[in-house]
Every structure is written in structure tokens, then in C-alpha cells.
Amino acid sequence: EGEARETEAALNAAIGAQVPTLRSSVESVVTQLGALTDVVAARARYSDLVVLHLPYGKGRGVEDEAITEAALFEGMTPVLVVPPGGMATAQPKRIVLAWNQSREALVAARRAMPFLKRAEMVQIVVIDPPAHGPERSDPGGQLCQLLVRHGVRAEVSVLARTLPRISEVLARHARDVN
């Protein structure tokens, strides 16, 4: 628990130094592993943005994946997954927006609109779109139109799933487009 408190203090200090006018919070919660996803989802629902590290890789456990999925699918709020090296700025100029035509993806895209509007470019990334479905001829096209109507500069990238995890494909694409 002491390590968690130290991490909380360090995160609060880092956030305060990055954007002094930003109103934010970092919370420590003690819970059973089985209830962790419910706690994360409940906190995420009343947040404007959830910031998490990549759930896979060295030093990551099964709880990291569960936390990310709870925030993404149950939290109904935008989730910013920070790459291992961190972010160069608190206001990114290029945003990669994962799109799979799901309700959760649409809710997250709508709620992320303030962030998307401030970006210079939003890359809508569709990985292995379905061969049959309403967007089969133009995957991500309808979302792109929605974003453009809101003043967002957006384009669609359709990628093949060439790595075991979708998150790895997204992370690689984010690095590729800087």
C-alpha cells in the first residue's frame, strides 16, 4: 500500500507540473482483485478522461488488461493509453482513434470530441474490418464524416492485424505516424 501511495503522490505532482490549471485527481483504492473492474468502471463513468499505461509488456499483470478493458467498455468515457516513453506534450497534435463500429467506440469518440477538435489530425484506425456489414465498402467513413461535421480534421487508415494483440497494432501505428 505504501508503494501505491507514493505512486499516487508522484502522479499528482507530475500532472500539476504539466498543466497547472488542469483540475484532476488520482485516486488510490484498496479492493479485491475480483472487484477491481467494477471499481475502475464506476470511477471512469464520472471522469472526463481516463489515463492509463499500455496494459501489455514487461512488468504488466493480468490486472492491467482488466483495468484497461473496464475503463474502455464499462466506463463509457475516453481512455488515453500512454506509450511506454510517455507523451511529449499534454495536448497532442495527432490522435489515433481506434474504431470497430461498436457502441462503446462511438460513445468514446463522442466524449473525446473536445480533444479531437484541438488536434491537428485525427487518424481513425480500423483493423481488419468485417467483410459484411454496413461499413464494408467504406470502413470508418461514417465516423470520419461525423468528426468532420464537428470541425475535426480526420482521415481513415485501414490496417491488417499483423500482431497478436489489437493494442500492439495500434501502438505500432501510433509510433509510425508520430
Predicted regions and their residues:
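Conserved N-terminal ligand/cofactor-binding loop architecture of enzyme catalytic domains
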Residues: 1-17
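Acidic, proline/glycine-rich short linear motifs
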Residues: 1-5, 122-149, 176
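Soluble or luminal CAZymes and related metallo-dependent hydrolases
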Residues: 3-7, 32, 63, 104, ...
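Structural beta-alpha unit
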Residues: 13-50, 149-178
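Intrinsically disordered or low-complexity boundary/linker segments at protein termini
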Residues: 23, 27, 40-126
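A short, flexible beta-alpha/helix-coil linker loop
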Residues: 31-34, 56-58, 128-131
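Charged helix-capping and loop-helix junction motifs
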Residues: 64-67, 137-141, 171-173
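A general structural motif
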Residues: 101-113, 134-140, 163-167
